[in-house]
Amino acid sequence: MHLPFPRRKFLKAALTTGAASGLLLTSWGRKVLAAVANPETNRVFSHGVASGDPTHDSVLLWTRISVANSKTVSWELALDSDFARVVQSGSRETGQARDHTVKIIAENLHPGQSYYYRFRADGVVSEPGRTRTLPEGSLARLGLAIASCSNFPFGFFNAYEVIAADPEVDFVLHLGDYIYEYGSDGWGADEGAEIGRVHSPAHEIVGLEDYRQRHAQYKSDVGSRLMHAAHPLICTWDDHESTN
């Protein structure tokens, strides 16, 4: 049975019904939800934004543009979600050789500080991401969300949506199996066929283009986009990143 209510429509409904109440509580969260539901944003940034590998004074920022004719991507890092206090900015060239992705290592940052970032390409601005550097010294608390074994066809990434909306989370620690290499006959294939989440490409991934396509599919999931926009990721690998 196919779901009658697509995830994009769910997000649009969330803006008016409070279905994503955790994100709707903040100005930044409302901007993210509006951007993810915006067709123009999805035309250029259908895989969203992400951050990760934080240190006490740096963090990696990422995006992928979905329009092949746009090669210059600009970025901003700010102390506020309105980007009134931009602390770093720049531009980066991208293209087919790097699958139209952009990676920025923002350096010389303050420990334990929250930042907001966004990208611009083809006249369109991405959803604003929120990230954070690692703290220094003794801590009263640290909020970690733990994720693992994210098999796209086996079900929707609603746990990612919960993580995105949790204000107590500082970082997401993903313990591996961020993707699964299976083809359309692998574990979870029956469930995926039932709910309309079949692996792409349909065969087991073995080459660079296969992996790019599979990662792009996982990054296009709404829950994944919300989680990556909300929190920086600290990742370890397990076996399914390459092969079982």
Label each region the model flagged:
Residues 3, 25-62, 143:
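C-terminal segment of N-terminal export signals and the immediately downstream linker at the start
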Residues 1-19:
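N-terminal secretory signal peptides and thylakoid transit peptides that target proteins
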Residues 71-141, 153-157, 161-162:
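Extended acidic/polar, glycine-enriched regions
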